[in-house]
Amino acid sequence: MKFVNLIRAHLFLILLASGLVSAGEKTSSIVFTGTENAVVVNQHSNSVSYLNLGETVEKVGEISVGLSPQTVAYDADRQLVWVTNQGENSVSILSSTSPRRFGVIKTKAAPYGVIISNKFAFVSSQHSNLIQVFDKYNYVLIAEIRVEDKPRGLTLTSDEKWLYTTHFDSGKISKIDAQRFEIIETISLGNRAGLTQSISIDQNEKFAYIPNTIRNTDSTSLEFDTSVFPFVSIVDLENRKHLRSQRIALDIIDEPVGLPLSSRLVGDNLFVLNAASNDISVVDIKLNLLSAHIEVGSFPVGIVQGPDQRYLYVDNSIDGSVSVIEASTLVEIDRQPVTQIPLDNDTREGIRLFHTSNDTRMAKDQWISCATCHFNGGSDNLVWNFPDGLRSTPSLIASSHTGPFHWSGNLDELHDVEDTIRDLQGGTGLIDGPANCVPTCDSAEKNEGRSEALDNLAKYITSLKFDATATNTANTQDTELSKQRGARLFRSFEFSCSACHAAPLYTDNENHIVNLAEGGKATINTPSLLELARSSPYYHDGRFKTLHELLDRHPADIEGQSQVNLEGDSVADLVSFLESISRPAFLSLPALLTSTEAPVSQSPLNGISRVSLELVVNKESPHALEISYTHSGNSAFDTFLIVEHLATAAYWYFENNSTIKKFRLGADIMPMSIHQISEGVHRHEMPNILLDNLDLAGEIFTFHAIATERGASPYDALNWLFYDVKEIEL
């Protein structure tokens, strides 16, 4: 039997091994772990609280976790909870019954969502653009699914066949095959949609409801009620289509609300948590009408329904409380604190002011907050039409060290945000009296000390620092050498980049005259180069989408500067360095997890492996292949690579990653690689594999990659843990 027929006869057995048991789940910051027991993530306390929930809230325990915990998932099979620590690139594994810590799993950069299936834990890595898949029994990393930018919220269908993820900035959702760990399609909610964090799926799993904010970046007259709009978008999951004409405008069916982030569907009622306006819009999805408007605590981000379905519980993240909503009356009947946020009163008040639109001093009609454009103190990575021209949104993290502020450098103190609060957000302001920005903010009297509330807001912005861990990248010898070459170019006399971008902040905090893309000139303050990889688009007006584009024009667009000649790999080397610039320690938060010991593993339910092939013909040598493969396994496994030529029924196999040998079907063959123990995702590269001896140029070859349990025969498809196939013409 040819290998192709063997594959068709037995491939379904591999899919059955994934198991389809548990009910559908979605990411949340609060989950039930029993009939009355629940755990909630305390984002600003860096902890998790254990609760007894009924018609009131009783806190029974609390345990510290890593920096900036975000969501929690319950593993009923093992009585554990998984908590993502976004600020430390890790997941804490805790007991679900009492405050006990079992260990920590390291992840890629900025994990946000976590969801547990029958066998796996799925974790979204927001800054690495990956969905990581772990065996939930022995914690081995089984797969990494490459997706578009900033994956965040996760939802798993009840049959565990499909996984959906939101993309926070771009207003997209991706559909993923949760058995083969492959992306199927990415669906856009429109190029203005963003801040997409949650997906709720109806009971028939035909439609998805995604809260989001439409950002009107085309507006040339920015006002509080023309810049952003709160919506719920609807996606037809069967046809993978955004139903644009059916989307729900929350400001029309409800009163104006701010920053709809999370949601939960209960029957026909969709509970939409409007984080900035501190309320819930309950929408009847059949009638497209408002069922109720519920006021809750500060910045609600998570909601869960109790097992008896009598109550819903809301995580109010900024005031560290949980609200109880009676399902029959849709009324908040209780709200209790579940943590004491370990910050001084002034900073806590600053956090509240920064995130709220439910304060007439900060916003008009609950429409917009500082966090709408600067979520978590960062940037929305958009370009807006301000009176002085197109301006990309800068991050506020560590900004207190890089004044003056704004691209034009026209704010000489953080307290001058009073002008933005009044002019853009429509608030009455935090100061009694003028904003002291006439004729300009930097020429008027100081605002510091004029308002306790404004001082508190400025204190919070000043406290913003980078996470404890940098964005992790694969550091090979080649990439390290490229960074070193780029660093030498950056500091060289010829290029003199460091003249304006000196370490450790990589800015001179000075204004320079820049030639504008539309003609004319403008005075622009030198931006810091810290975290440059995550701050696209580049320049004050966002004219450059990539650093490669920027380096093609810069610094010749600075008055008095001439263009430098970057040849060969110099641009790539300089970009490699720019994207790897280290943040100074005083601008980074300290890690909280002093021990990152992995939890004690259990034997997995059954052997699972994954293997993925990449084949590239060397352009300079048509008979030379660049072969790479990525594989993993939760137990000991072998990986075979077999080459098939259908026209002649000839077969070859690879031995030890380099040697290729011809064989007849049925003969003993050696694995390409052997793993005596479980092994997480790792990559092998076999450059310049010469196939001249095959003498079959122009023919099509089929490459079969097969993973089996250690020592098992690759001829029996029942032994296959995974299979991948690629065709290539030499």
Spans of model-derived segments:
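Short loop/turn segments that connect beta-strands within beta-propeller blades
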Residues: N52-T56, S95-P99, D135-Y139, D177-F181, ...
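Beta-strand-rich domains and repeat architectures in extracellular enzymes and scaffolds
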Residues: A23-N46, G258-L261
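Short beta-strand elements
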Residues: S713-L730
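Periplasmic c-type cytochrome electron-transfer domains
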Residues: A23, D169, Q179, G194-L222, ...
